């Protein structure tokens, strides 16, 4: 996987502890970026959902992508979606723009990766930075 916002600072890493999250920790990574920042596909895949998605309203305007090999990702809190449901996307493709929608404390991208069965459950969350680091090495 590649970073969905290359060069942007991570403000809330995976598993940061906090009572505001259901499991007591953050289930993805947050990248600080102004509204309108280009969001890119972290890997090739197929767009499963756009807009208000089934993963929950707290994600705001979002894109859910099946990246294959048992991985799905959500790109959340977007101001703009540039892809459609069912569309095939490529690594690095501009798919949306950062925003401040849903349960958000300011403009950023929330990037979360899950493995099958893709539920909102502790055993389904994966640290995206580990996957990005694997690609880089």
Residue ranges and their predicted role:
Residues 74-78, 106-114:
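Histidine-centered catalytic micro-motifs
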Residues 1-2, 32, 81-93, 112-137:
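Acidic, glycine-rich catalytic/binding loops that coordinate metals and/or anionic ligands
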Residues 29-32, 61-68, 110-112:
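Short, acidic/hydrophobic/Gly-rich beta-strand patch recurrent on exposed beta strands
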Residues 20, 64-74:
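Short, basic/aromatic beta-hairpin or loop at an interaction surface
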Residues 37, 69-72, 122:
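Short acidic/polar mixed-charge low-complexity motifs
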Residues 43-44, 71-80:
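Short, solvent-exposed beta-edge and connector elements
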Residues 14, 51, 79-82, 117:
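A generic structural motif
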Residues 1-61, 91, 100, 104:
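Surface-exposed, glycine-biased beta-strand/turn segments
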């Amino acid at each position: 996987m590649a970073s969905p916002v290359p060069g942007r600072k991570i403000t809330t890493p995976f598993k940061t502890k906090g009572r505001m999250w259901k499991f007591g920790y953050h289930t993805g990574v947050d990248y600080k970026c102004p509204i309108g920042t280009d969001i890119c596909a972290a890997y090739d895949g197929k767009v499963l959902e756009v807009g208000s998605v089934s993963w929950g309203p707290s994600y705001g305007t979002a894109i859910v992508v099946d990246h294959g090999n048992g991985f799905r990702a959500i790109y959340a809190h977007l101001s703009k979606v540039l892809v459609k449901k069912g569309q095939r996307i490529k690594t690095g493709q501009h798919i949306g723009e950062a925003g401040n929608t849903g349960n958000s404390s300011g403009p950023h991208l929330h990037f979360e990766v899950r493995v099958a069965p893709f539920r909102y459950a502790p055993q389904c969350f994966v640290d995206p930075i580990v996957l990005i680091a694997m690609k880089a090495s």
